[in-house]
């Protein structure tokens, strides 16, 4: 059971909340979180780098000069890897970098990473009604009242996000702020942020989605 204080829009403590998420054992926690992080970063690779071998480069079918008698080194093709414009030896080819991780392990890693950041977790009341219109300045001021240091990396987790939502429109222009929905939780964002701000409703949704 984890306890955390709840702050309002003005940054005042207005209550406490508790949540419970099953995490990995202490001796295996860092290992499973590391596996999930490596999987996420590896799966983000496009894997479409491609070079041409001497067989794929256009031209080079004719022997550039006769084998003997010219005084130059023998050559069989102008597309030899030794030549400028020739093929590439052992160059990259399109490949699949995807790593597999069981669903139970992925969820366990997410829960472990989330609970592991409890010291940097800031729980706030729902504040969408506080922004009557998109206003980045007001959201930046609220983050400062909640304890997010300017220029530090912050992760803001909402229960859901709409493109027309005032919170989304206010947050998208803040350089070091990442905005995600509760069902978009991922290990990289949890570990990368200096502070994690989560609304009370998003915290409930996280328990609902990831508790199993």
Curated annotation (Swiss-Prot):
Signal sequence coordinates: none
Gene3D superfamilies cross-referenced by the UniProt entry: 3.40.1370.10
Disulfide bridge map: none
Gene Ontology MF: a single term: rRNA binding
GO CC term (a single one): ribonucleoprotein complex
Biased composition (Basic residues): 60-71
Location of the region described as Disordered in the Swiss-Prot/TrEMBL record: 45-71
Alphabetical UniProt keywords: Ribonucleoprotein, Ribosomal protein, RNA-binding, rRNA-binding
Domain of life: Bacteria
One GO biological process term: translation
Record family assignment: Belongs to the universal ribosomal protein uL4 family.
Subunit structure: Part of the 50S ribosomal subunit.
Function (record text): One of the primary rRNA binding proteins, this protein initially binds near the 5'-end of the 23S rRNA. It is important during the early stages of 50S assembly. It makes multiple contacts with different domains of the 23S rRNA in the assembled 50S subunit and ribosome. Forms part of the polypeptide exit tunnel.
Protein name per the record: Large ribosomal subunit protein uL4
Organism field: Nostoc punctiforme (strain ATCC 29133 / PCC 73102)
């Amino acid at each position: 059971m984890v306890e955390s204080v709840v702050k309002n829009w003005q940054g005042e403590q207005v209550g406490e909340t508790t949540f419970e998420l099953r995490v990995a054992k202490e001796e295996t926690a860092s290992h499973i979180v590391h596996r999930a992080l490596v999987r996420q970063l590896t799966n983000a690779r496009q894997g479409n780098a491609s070079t041409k071998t001497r067989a794929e480069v256009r031209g080079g079918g004719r022997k550039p000069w006769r084998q003997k008698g010219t005084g130059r080194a023998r050559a069989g093709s102008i597309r030899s890897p030794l030549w400028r414009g020739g093929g590439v030896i052992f160059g990259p080819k399109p490949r699949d970098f995807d790593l597999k991780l069981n669903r139970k392990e992925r969820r366990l890693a997410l829960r472990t990473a989330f609970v592991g950041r409890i010291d940097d977790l800031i729980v706030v009341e729902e504040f969408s009604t506080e922004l009557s219109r998109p206003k980045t300045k007001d959201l930046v001021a609220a983050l400062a009242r909640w304890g997010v240091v300017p220029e530090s990396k912050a992760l803001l987790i909402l229960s859901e996000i709409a493109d027309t939502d005032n919170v989304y429109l206010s947050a998208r222009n803040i350089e070091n702020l990442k905005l995600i929905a509760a069902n978009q939780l991922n290990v990289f964002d949890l570990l990368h942020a200096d502070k994690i701000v989560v609304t009370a409703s998003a915290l409930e949704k996280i328990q609902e989605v990831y508790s199993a």
